[in-house]
Amino acid sequence: MTMNIRRVLRTIAISGLWVALFSMTVEAKTKVTSESFGKMPDGAPVEIFTLSDGPYEARVATYGGIVVSLRVPDRNGKPADVVLGFDNVDGYLANFNGPADAFFGALIGRYANRIAHGSFTLDGRKYSLPLNNGENSLHGGPHGFNNVVWKAKPIANGVELSYLSKDGEAGYPGNLSAVVRYTLMKGDLRIEYSAATDKDTVVNLTNHSYFNLAGKGDILDHRLTLHASRFTPVDVGLIPTGELKSVASTPFDFRKATAVGARIHADDEQLHRGRGYDHNWVLDTDSGGGKLGEAAELYDPSSGRVLKVLTDQPGIQFYSGNFLDGSIKGKGGKPYELHSALCLETQHFPDSPNHPDFPTTELKPSQRYHTVTVYSFSVR
């Protein structure tokens, strides 16, 4: 192991020690178990961890760090799985390596969302990335963090996943040591991301869970609130134009709770380009100093389930399941139809490495990447 890689791992280990010391002061109430979830094509085992806290249950796989299922009670106390996915690792392997990769429930890296033409310049050097979304690189390319097996260990109230992305992997510079911690407590699924590098690089991590709070049907009647006065318009390739546009008097104004389907078919150029909503909103919450702010709220009137999204990130991608067309058969062989779920992906803005005016995603060896997102469930 090279000296640089040792230094990166040491940085992550020290940060992990502080988390462990803090966790020792918190009573662990969530039951954490693990079992086999299948095997990779090369025979490598894949585990699935089950986090159980009363009526709440999350299952997380070591392949792709996938949130495989998330069971949440409705207003009558009846639980249902509120995320899309597959019954076993074979389903994810087929989807993630096929032409209709939907990234169901997966950890996304090294760079969430799109990078135009699969290239960016850092410190005067141009880097080229594999293309997997037309002329662009999407969610780290065809061999991103969703398509690797993470090392895992149980921690208080959850599971810790770690992965070393080597220098040059998927075209990105630097040995990047990433650690992601999933914890479940009292209806809060907390995702904590950390990373360190031995060379200047770019990092933007998120989770790509598809939510349907009813556990069935479509999400067009879900009420969505986004705490954002601006969004980033996109070109025909869904790459930000660089403009930060006001949502006022547009179908993108979700500052007050609005049904997802209320304006999704409006005659709007941006909606036409995304075939619905597939855009980044610029959050109004102050993310300075790592403080968590409420980014979004989703409410399903039929079940009473409420999802609040809290984050310290500057943006959130709202994707309304526009490319689901029934061709993908998910859990129990159920076809995932148009708008059968939506994504709320906390993030830095798409294509930030090519937009100097956007919040930076650069990470230096002297820095530590750290961000937290909480998906908080309740009923109304």
Regions found by a protein language model. Give the residues of each.
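N-terminal amphipathic/basic-hydrophobic helices that include classical n-h-c signal peptides
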Residues: M1-T2, T241
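Bacterial N-terminal signal peptides that target proteins for export
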Residues: T2-S15
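C-terminal segment of classical bacterial N-terminal signal peptides
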Residues: V19-E27
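An exposed, glycine/acidic-rich loop-and-rim segment of catalytic or binding clefts
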Residues: K29-R380
